[in-house]
Amino acid sequence: MSGVWVFRNGVVKLVENPPASANSGGGGGGGGGGGGGGIRRKALLHMPTGEVVTSYASLERKLAALGWERYYSGGGGAAAAAAMMLQFHKRSSVDLISLPKDFSQFGSVHMYDIVVKNRDAFRVIDV
């Protein structure tokens, strides 16, 4: 059950979202669905260049220029989970950016994580 709570004339009611199958395009990556039914896709914009990030290769170059390095987990219980992700860390902070290995699963949550940790370099936009 998902939706939006609407307050009108002193009454609060839940207006439910249509099921995912009602939206054209269905499910997936790229940050927001299939482009129809009112769902807006999101993209990560690198503000200094005005370039939209379209691959992990370009994202990794941009993050490296900001001091981020690939982080390779060193075994233990988290190794299996880390093998499913790309991770970046910055030596000057305790921050860690974790992204799914498959770029098609790169969504708005991951984009906003990058934006919060690099406020002057990235922005999430509607496409």
From Swiss-Prot:
Disulfide bonds: none annotated. InterPro entries: FPF1. Residues 24-38 have a biased composition (Gly residues). GO terms for biological process: regulation of flower development. Transmembrane segments: none annotated. Residues 18-40 are annotated as: Disordered. Belongs to the FPF1 family. This is Flowering-promoting factor 1-like protein 2.
